[in-house]
């Protein structure tokens, strides 16, 4: 807020990332209120949160929390081909600016394969309530079981003051005698489980 106050006439757009790669969600409502108080729009890089609208078990989506626009990478958490993404807005002024810029900078030869994949993905999401319910039920079951591990810790909402995406299974090895990368290696070689990412702890 200090930056917005100091540069009130210069800052027209604030960009934040939420959720993080690990699933932590920012307080978008408070951030959007601060931005709007100073005349700035809020764009959220919601790349890892494209699935949020499809279950109450997930955090609320950015546009519902006051963001003016959001970028969603469908391919990260939904069934869509790599490179597919959406830029969404509920702000008419931004919508006009986006349309004008797309007319200038967008390719005249878009990939119909990727656009078709987006359509297929959106159709799946609109007609798969049962699948999302089952997915969230499985996530909660797995998370409850992982809480019983003696030396490995699974992160959840109780570990942060912010909202958290239960779809991110983040496990800490800080209290174990192996590193995160070593655990990933064991899971891969011994159990054929491939982790998406591994850090030192």
Question: Residue ranges of each PLM-predicted region?
Answer:
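Conserved C-terminal alpha-helix-loop-beta "cap" of PLP-dependent enzymes
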Residues: 141-201
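Conserved PLP-enzyme active-site core in the AAT-like
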Residues: 1-156
């Amino acid at each position: 807020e200090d930056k917005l106050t100091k540069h009130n006439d210069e800052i027209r757009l604030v960009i934040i990332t939420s959720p993080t790669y690990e699933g932590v969600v920012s307080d978008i409502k408070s951030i959007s209120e601060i931005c709007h108080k100073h005349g700035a729009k809020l764009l959220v890089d919601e790349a890892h949160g494209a699935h949020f609208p499809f279950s109450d078990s997930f955090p609320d989506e950015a546009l519902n929390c006051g963001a003016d626009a959001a970028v969603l990478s469908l391919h990260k958490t939904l069934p869509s081909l790599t490179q597919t993404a959406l830029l969404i807005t509920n702000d008419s002024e931004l919508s006009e600016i986006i349309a004008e810029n797309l007319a200038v900078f967008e390719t005249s030869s878009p990939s119909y394969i990727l656009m078709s994949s987006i359509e297929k993905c959106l159709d799946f999401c609109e007609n798969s309530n049962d699948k999302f319910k089952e997915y969230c039920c499985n996530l909660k079951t797995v998370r409850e079981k992982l809480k019983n591990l003696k030396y490995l810790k699974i992160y959840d909402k109780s570990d942060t003051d912010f909202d958290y995406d239960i779809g991110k299974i983040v496990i800490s090895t800080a209290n174990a005698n192996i590193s995160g990368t070593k655990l990933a290696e064991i899971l891969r070689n011994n159990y054929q489980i491939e982790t998406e990412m591994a850090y030192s702890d």
